[in-house]
């Protein structure tokens, strides 16, 4: 089961899948997952996360990180210290749903908050800020497989 195949029927502007240097990145816009300024996951989000869970549960050797990203607009909501806090809470909310609702093994997941420090666009317009508010699932390559590839490359180079 591939992520593109499973998520293909979702709106392209809300989900983006990229592969760079052997790492798979799945970015999901925050409007699909959360209400503004909130880390409570929406009903629509559970549908998307269920599809992601199906793929990762089919590949038990995959480990992945769930990253929360925000724009740079200061947040003033009770219970949330700042954008970094919000990004961590959003990543953790996604990880908990994957574990509790879809039985993804918690040892395979890392939750990380990135705040507004890794934008995909300048924060100069509301459209660009919306692009920066996202949750990114980073499928991590297994290091032992990575080292095997390096060793093979070294042997081939000799």
Feature names for model-found ranges:
Residues 1-18:
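Extracellular/lumenal/periplasmic "stalk" regions immediately C-terminal to a signal peptide or transmembrane helix
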Residues 6, 51-52:
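A ubiquitous structural signal for well-ordered alpha-helices
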Residues 19-23:
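Short Gly/Ser/Thr- and Asp/Glu-enriched loop/turn motifs at secondary-structure junctions
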Residues 24-29:
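Short, aliphatic-rich beta-strand segments
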Residues 33-51, 59, 69-158:
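Periplasmic OmpA-like peptidoglycan-binding domain that tethers envelope proteins to the cell wall
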């Amino acid at each position: 089961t591939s992520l593109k195949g499973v998520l293909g029927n979702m709106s392209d502007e809300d989900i983006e899948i990229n592969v760079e240097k052997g790492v798979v990145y799945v970015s999901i816009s925050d409007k699909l997952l959360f209400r503004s300024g909130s880390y409570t996951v929406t009903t629509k989000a559970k549908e998307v996360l269920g599809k992601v869970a199906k793929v990762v549960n089919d590949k038990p050797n995959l480990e992945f990180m769930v990253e929360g990203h925000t724009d740079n607009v200061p947040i003033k909501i009770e219970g949330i210290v700042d954008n970094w806090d919000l990004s961590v809470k959003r990543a953790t909310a996604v990880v908990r749903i994957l574990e509790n609702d879809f039985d993804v093994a918690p040892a395979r997941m890392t939750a990380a908050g990135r705040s507004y420090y890794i934008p995909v666009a300048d924060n100069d317009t509301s459209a660009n800020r919306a692009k920066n508010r996202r949750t990114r699932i980073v499928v991590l390559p297994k290091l032992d497989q990575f080292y095997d590839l390096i060793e093979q490359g070294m042997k081939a180079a000799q």
